[in-house]
Amino acid sequence: ITAISGNTTEAGGTATFGISLDTAPLTTTTVAIDLSSSNELEGTINGSVANNLTLTFDEFNWSTTQIVTLTGVDDLLEDSDQPYTIITSVTTTADPDYIGLNPLNVSVTNLDDDSFGILVTAISGNTSEAGTTATFDVRLKSAPGINVTIDISSSTEAEGIISGSVAN
């Protein structure tokens, strides 16, 4: 297994590593290595929705490195950088040199792109004594772990009052 090229990101950034065999398997024999992600909510393998991959080697391609691409998944949570593992399974083969061989797992981190905070859009329109309104939107930068309440008030109620609605 070659060294991983870096980390994945919640913005869809990828990391890669490669796998090849040290020796050729017996003629007409294949060696299969199954890969899966320990946390498909943080990273996927080769963009697979099924989140698993089987690499197959034979007497012709055993020394050719097969590249595995990992893609970060955005969870919309401010949960810091999250480590996950690409789990390799025991090889499937009839070749005695590879029976029961379990390649090393690959550790990777999905870099978080979410942050805590509140976003307020620029005000649209102006209020007037004739009753015209102005609007602005308030939203969270990322999904909260618990309910969040934001109090909004007017500094001078004689000049304007606050009313609004909640949208999800």
Question: Residue ranges of each PLM-predicted region?
Answer:
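Short boundary segments that mark the start of a structured unit
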Residues: 1-168
